[in-house]
């Protein structure tokens, strides 16, 4: 494993450990960001199941002409995820940025999810 991969894995683990301490049974909003797409899901760690998910690969996103590599797509994914989570009865989550900096696409997704009804 390269030094960069080890550093990223440690950062991701450190963030997840801190989240477990503060979660208090709340579901986790997990974000994965690749160079071309962005994915997000609300996970109930106590049951081990995904409650809601959204990504820039979905048909509705592709038809709108959004690629996942920009802030507009991240906002759309955040809004879609929040709507699906609220429909499932989830209103409070813990934000898991997954070791990514809270900046750019990750921040845009989080802000859109907040505006659409999720609180964290």
UniProtKB/Swiss-Prot annotation:
GO terms for molecular function: 5S rRNA binding; structural constituent of ribosome. One of its GO terms (biological process) is translation. Keywords: Ribonucleoprotein, Ribosomal protein, RNA-binding, rRNA-binding. It comes from the Bacteria. Belongs to the universal ribosomal protein uL18 family. Part of the 50S ribosomal subunit; part of the 5S rRNA/L5/L18/L25 subcomplex. Contacts the 5S and 23S rRNAs. This is one of the proteins that bind and probably mediate the attachment of the 5S RNA into the large ribosomal subunit, where it forms part of the central protuberance. This is Large ribosomal subunit protein uL18. The gene is rplR.
């Amino acid at each position: 494993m390269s030094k960069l991969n080890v550093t990223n894995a440690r950062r991701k683990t450190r963030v997840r450990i801190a989240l477990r301490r503060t979660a208090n049974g709340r579901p986790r909003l997990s974000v994965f960001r690749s160079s071309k797409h962005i994915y997000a899901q609300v996970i109930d760690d106590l049951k081990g199941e995904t409650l809601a998910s959204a990504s820039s690969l979905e048909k509705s996103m592709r038809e709108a002409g959004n690629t996942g590599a920009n802030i507009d797509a991240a906002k759309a994914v955040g809004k879609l995820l929040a709507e699906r989570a609220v429909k499932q009865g989830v209103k409070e989550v813990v934000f898991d940025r997954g070791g990514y900096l809270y900046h750019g696409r990750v921040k845009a997704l989080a802000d859109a999810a907040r505006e659409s009804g999720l609180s964290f």
